[in-house]
A protein has these predicted regions:
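Proline-threonine-serine-rich low-complexity tracts
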Residues: 2-83
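Structural signal for short hydrophobic segments within the conserved structured cores
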Residues: 11-13, 138-140, 243-245
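Functional beta-strand-loop-alpha-helix junction segments that form "active/interaction loops"
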Residues: 139-147
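A secondary-structure boundary/capping signal
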Residues: 47, 92-93, 247
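Serine-esterase "nucleophile elbow" of acetyl-processing enzymes
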Residues: 80-140, 156-162
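Ser/Thr-centric signal marking residues that sit
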Residues: 56, 63, 97, 210, ...
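Alpha-helical cap/lid subdomain in secreted, periplasmic
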Residues: 116, 121-136, 149-288
Length: 289
């Protein structure tokens, strides 16, 4: 008579779920050894079953023709998809939020290819990670807008979009059209401060972006003005309890790749880098752990 059957279960299995319900898990039935005659192997839950989020112990039993059995078990862990505390995100700003760029050698040939603005790419990144939620990113960019004049439009957009999160990125135009450089800096700082305060008052989590660097040789805003504005944006973020997204620090190391030939607007790669940076900031601040 043959020895009693033996069975060895597979190693623990971990699967990421596409939704909070669970996930179907397929696995190979353990192979039995020894035993009399044909040995059957049955596992519960069976391969292909839907396992709930969490840890499930799977029991496997081998039975030979003499009804002798051997058993083993292994764990199946279903990891719930990540979730975000916010699902409605309003990107508010100027032409860099619109996504204007230059694809030719003409520094005045501005275009905004569909799906390439940072809010559009941000939406793609968020949707790919938070598969169990519907994340909406509203692009509320306006070409040529000055931050200190933006409040009426901001309020209208906020009432319409009802965002949980507001991302602010503007201030270039305030400096460029200011009566003096000092007034331009002051207007940018005033505008972002008021917008951040209003967004917080209305219950949104606020993210403030520093201004991107200019391209060497074509910089339209002097380095001192950028440094001054960005330093005050950092202060505003602290004072208003906002999250600072330091785009200047991220884009400066490879400015020729990220900034268009006009020295102000970003390249398609630059907008993707902005989206990745804002995505990382939102994930760090708002992902449920």
């Amino acid at each position: 008579m043959a020895d009693a059957p033996e069975i060895t279960c597979p190693d623990p299995i971990t699967v990421s779920a596409g939704s909070g319900v669970g996930a179907a898990v397929s696995y190979a039935l353990p192979e039995s050894r020894k035993g009399q005659g044909a040995v059957s192997v049955v596992c519960t839950p069976s391969p292909g079953s839907t396992f709930p989020v969490g840890v499930t112990q799977t029991q496997c039993v081998a039975t030979d023709t003499l009804s002798r059995t051997a058993s083993c078990s292994f764990s199946v862990t279903i990891v719930a998809p990540p979730r975000l505390r916010a699902t409605r995100i309003m990107a508010f700003g100027d032409s860099l939020t619109v996504g204007q760029t230059i694809l030719s050698n003409d520094p005045y040939d501005f275009v905004a290819p569909p799906g390439t603005s940072y809010p559009a790419v941000l939406g793609q990144l968020l949707s790919a990670r938070y598969t169990d939620q519907t994340i909406t990113v509203f692009n509320r960019g306006l070409i040529g807008e000055q931050a200190w004049r933006a409040m009426p439009r901001f309020i209208d957009a906020f009432v319409t979009d009802r965002p949980d999160v507001v991302v602010l990125q503007e201030g270039y135009n305030d400096y460029r059209v200011g009566e003096t450089p000092a007034i331009g800096v002051a207007n940018a700082v005033l505008g972002i401060s008021e917008l951040a305060r209003e967004a917080r008052r209305r219950g949104a989590r606020v993210f403030i972006c520093t201004l991107a660097p200019g391209r060497p040789g074509r910089v339209q805003i002097p380095a001192w003005a950028l440094e001054d504005i960005n330093a005050q944006y950092r202060r505003i973020a602290r004072d208003e309890g906002a999250v600072l997204v330091d785009l200047y620090a991220v884009l400066a190391p490879d400015v020729n790749a990220y900034v268009s030939i006009d020295g102000l607007h970003l390249t398609l790669l630059g907008y993707r880098r902005v989206a990745e940076t804002v995505f990382a900031a939102i994930r760090a601040e708002l992902e449920i752990r």
